[in-house]
Amino acid sequence: MVAVPARYASTRLPGKPLQLIGDRPMIQHVAERALAAGAREVWVATDDARIAEAIQGLAGVRVAMTSSVHLSGTDRLAECARIAGWDAATCVVNLQGDEPFAPAAGIRAVAQVLQRSGAEMATLAAPVDSAHDLFDPNVVKLVRNAHGDALYFSRAPIPWHRDSFAAQRDAVPAGNHWLRHIGIYAYRAGFLQQFAAMPPGTLERIESLEQLRVLEAGYRIAVALTPEQFPPGIDTPEDLQRAQAQLASA
């Protein structure tokens, strides 16, 4: 299953799911990427009838009308899972509603990582390729253990290369030690309910990163490198303009 949380309200880009990219709203592009990945079912979890209407009639896509009081996409998807009646063992991929160019290979990969790892949750990462991204707090970094599980996620440049960063911070040091997190997740429907029911942890509150709740509670998050480049999501009017230009030039 692929589930897409989508809300109309957005501080930086109001009505984001309905913004047009080409001749189709963003939420339709996202749903089509999930279908291209071979998802058995695609669900859009929303609290807004306008979003539901935008994908009405799209073959293979269903809508779960959820509460308007959810604080996160995870909470919204947990309600979606209850509405859909998914078995606790069902694999659910959480694809963000602002990822209209998400590669199908990446969507499949995160589900495969969950299935083969035995972890409670799975996600993807990609090498950091610029100093700007390395030191940008809006680009989340992560470190893994020898088994490929996440040790920590941070807005800081981790691991901190003491010697290299003391000398300069305008290039990524050699060694391929730095990974940026790609915000796509997979979990079993049963664990999704557990996750949503957990109280926010101290680390989550400090970093404003929801996935830290899982690590702080002692659960595993398996991390694999994305098999294909994941374009950045759309958060601002400038991001939307770039996406529109990208589609127009394709």
Swiss-Prot record:
Compartment annotation: Cytoplasm
Any GO BP:
CMP-keto-3-deoxy-D-manno-octulosonic acid biosynthetic process
Alphabetical GO CC annotations of the entry are: cytosol
Q: In which pathway does it act?
A: Nucleotide-sugar biosynthesis; CMP-3-deoxy-D-manno-octulosonate biosynthesis; CMP-3-deoxy-D-manno-octulosonate from 3-deoxy-D-manno-octulosonate and CTP: step 1/1; Bacterial outer membrane biogenesis; lipopolysaccharide biosynthesis
Enzyme class, UniProt record, top EC level: transferase
According to the UniProt entry, its GO molecular function terms are: 3-deoxy-manno-octulosonate cytidylyltransferase activity
EC numbers listed for it are 2.7.7.38
Q: Which cysteines are joined by disulfide bonds?
A: none
Q: Write down the InterPro entries for this protein, in alphabetical order.
A: Cytidylyl_trans, KdsB, Nucleotide-diphossugar_trans
Reactions listed under catalytic activity? 3-deoxy-alpha-D-manno-oct-2-ulosonate + CTP = CMP-3-deoxy-beta-D-manno-octulosonate + diphosphate
Identify the main location.
cytoplasm
The domain of life is: Bacteria
Annotated keywords? Cytoplasm, Lipopolysaccharide biosynthesis, Nucleotidyltransferase, Transferase
Q: What does this protein do?
A: Activates KDO (a required 8-carbon sugar) for incorporation into bacterial lipopolysaccharide in Gram-negative bacteria.
Q: Which family does the record claim for this protein?
A: Belongs to the KdsB family.
Could you tell me what this protein is called? 3-deoxy-manno-octulosonate cytidylyltransferase
